[in-house]
Structures are given as structure tokens and as C-alpha cells.
Amino acid sequence: MADIYRFPKFSYEDNGTVEPLPLRTGPDKKAIPHIRIVKVGDPPKHGVRYLDLLLLGFFETPKQTTNLGSVSDLTEPTSYSICGSGSLPIGVAKYYGTDQELLKACTDLRITVRRTVRAGEMIVYMVDSIGAPLLPWSGRLRQGMIFNANKVALAPQCLPVDKDIRLRVVFVNGTSLGAITIAKIPKTLADLALPNSISVNLLVTLKTGISTEQKGVLPVLDDQGEKKLNFMVHLGLIRRKVGKIYSVEYCKSKIERMRLIFSLGLIGGISFHVQVNGTLSKTFMSQLAWKRAVCFPLMDVNPHMNMVIWAASVEITGVDAVFQPAIPRDFRYYPNVVAKNIGRIRKL
């Protein structure tokens, strides 16, 4: 069993909403490019901004032509057919220009895509034609980038391995950063196990503007019968001295003193941000890597949900602190289906 503390609405109502990407088509029946920028923290209204960018678009392959070797092959542009949709995260950089200049530079990129595999399926991106507005990101764009296929492609199985594939950028998601930085809790700290401790986890409830059932993301019904989505993130551990007895009121008082503020960003698709405005113990602060602002990209927490809702309107409708007994140290984590040294199975 777990005890729950519900955060007040003011802790997430200011920046807890993301507007949808408008899908409009032009005379050529192609989607009209659009850029969406949200603010996290208190970024400057004008001038230099720190922007985190995620490029969204369609994977395309050249269409088969029947008139091979004709003169029209040299004069007519190559036509493409869509084989999937996906994204390309290009990270944070200091940007000086306008949103429309940035959108134009992103849609002009020539992005070659290859599907491959290592320990798991991967997507390889190679980028060319980097315009001036994207020069702050050029250090990353000029190098080949490899991502987990299940995080950046909605249906990686639809990408052919024997054809040329390109990513045609249609939408740009940007997060303008202020005092809040993109600091993730390191995995070693998130997996930390301490004796005599209580795990503080956050249950985040979302309302989206699209139906997600047909895409494999089942909603849950709240008390009013509305369909909602939710996910959990780990914040840290509350530890008391040996011999001290935990109480729900003690844990709630620790959380209330933190004065947490929550917001949504567009890092990796949809991201959940936590800002600490109150007091923290040194033990808890060390678990946050000594940061007062941390980011939880949904791309890492729940990749499939992220891909289904990353272009939709998203709104935080509730955040709960869930107090659970910390997992004992002697419990073993099995990241693989094939367990080590079981029967005749041996890991190489």
C-alpha cells in the first residue's frame, strides 16, 4: 500500500498546458510547416534565448518510376511516399533569431535516415544543408546521431532497410529555457536504495486533446468519468534516523516545505519539469544531483505514450506525491528477459 499527497492546483496551473500542433495542408496536399515554442521557467521575452529543439516529420522513400532512363528523370523532381513518422532531438543551443527563420532552416535540412540494430533497434540520422539559423546546433548536426528506434520512430518496423529513407521535417517543437535548466536525475541516483527510507514518487495525470486508444495507449477514468493518462517519476528518498517511525504527516510536511512547482515542456516531445522553491534536506538535495530544477522527458519515461501525444494538446490535471517503502537492496533488478545462468542459457 502507498499513501498519497495531492498537490494544490496552483502548483501546476500556470505552465501546465501545451497547445496542439495544427495540422493544415496546402494546395499540394502536403502539411504546412509549423513551429511551436513553449516557455519553461522565466526566459527573456526578447533577444538571446536558450532553445531545446525537437524536429518532427515523416519518413519517406522515393517512389518507384516506370519510365526508367527517360529524359524526364533529369527534369522532374523525385517524388516520395510516406513510410512512417518520427522525430529528431537536436538539443539545446543559444539562439538569436526569429521563430520563422528557425522553422525555414529546419524544413530545408536534408536528413538521411537508416534503420539498424545494436543491442536494440536503432535509427541513424545524417544531416546536410545546415542553414545559418541552425549554426548554434551545428556541432551536433554535423555528426551522425543514433537513437533508440522505439523512442524516435512511431513504427520502426515500417522503415525499409533496402531503400533510401529521408526525414522530411514538418513541425518544430521548441522549449525556451529560463531559470529552469534541463537537468536529469542520473540513473545511479534514481536507482539508489537506502535502508530505513521512503520513496517519494510523483504520479502525473494528463488530459489530451486526442483519442489514444486506437494507438495502444489506454486511458483511465477519473472520478468524474473523464478519460485521463498518467505516468510516474521518481523524485527521491526520505530517510529518517534509525529507530524513528515514519508517519504520513511527516512525509507530507517534508514535501510541503519543498514548495514544488510543475510545468510541461516540449523536450523530446512532452517533458515534465519540477522546480524546487522551498527547503530541501542535504540527503534529498544530493539525490537531485544538487539541482533545484529537474526535467523528466516522457521520451525516457514512457516512449510510446510520448509518440502518441507529442503533437496533441496536453494539460496537467493533477500531481500526486506517492509515498512507498523503498525497494530493499537485496531485491534484484532483471533488465533482460533472459536471466543470467539459468539452465543451459549463458550470457556471452
From Swiss-Prot:
Cite a single GO MF annotation.
structural constituent of virion
Result of changing residue 197 to C: In strain: Mutant KD-22M
Instruction: Give the sites modified to Phosphoserine.
Output: 70
Highest taxon listed in the record's lineage: Viruses
Q: Which UniProt keywords apply?
A: Host cell membrane, Host cytoplasm, Host membrane, Host-virus interaction, Membrane, Phosphoprotein, Viral budding, Viral budding via the host ESCRT complexes, Viral matrix protein, Viral release from host cell, Virion
Outcome of altering residue 158 to S?
Answer: Complete loss of viral infectivity
Please name the Gene3D superfamilies in this protein's record: Viral matrix protein, C-terminal domain, Viral matrix protein, N-terminal domain
Localization recorded for this chain is: Virion; Host cytoplasm; Host cell membrane
Q: Which GO terms describe its biological process?
A: viral budding via host ESCRT complex
Task: Describe the PTM.
Answer: A large portion is phosphorylated in the cytoplasm, but not in virion. However, this phosphorylation is not essential for virus replication.
Q: Which InterPro entries match?
A: Matrix_C, Matrix_N, Matrix_Paramyxo_C, Matrix_Paramyxo_N
Q: What is the effect of changing residue 191 to Y?
A: In strain: Mutant KD-32M
Tell me the outcome of changing residue 294 to L: In strain: Mutant KD-52M
- Effect of mutating residue 237 to F: In strain: Mutant BY-4, Mutant BF-13 and Mutant BY-41
Q: Give the motif span (YLDL motif).
A: 50-53
The subunit structure is: Homomultimer. Binds to the cytoplasmic regions of F and HN proteins. Interacts with nucleocapsid. Interacts with human alpha-tubulin and beta-tubulin. Interacts with host ANP32B.
Role, per record: Plays a crucial role in virion assembly and budding. Forms a shell at the inner face of the plasma membrane and concentrates the HN and F glycoproteins. Acts as a negative regulator for transcription and replication by sticking to the nucleocapsid. This effect might be regulated by the cytoplasmic interaction with tubulin that dissociates the M protein from the nucleocapsid.
Protein name as it appears in the record: Matrix protein
Which source organism does the UniProt entry give? Sendai virus (strain Z) (SeV)
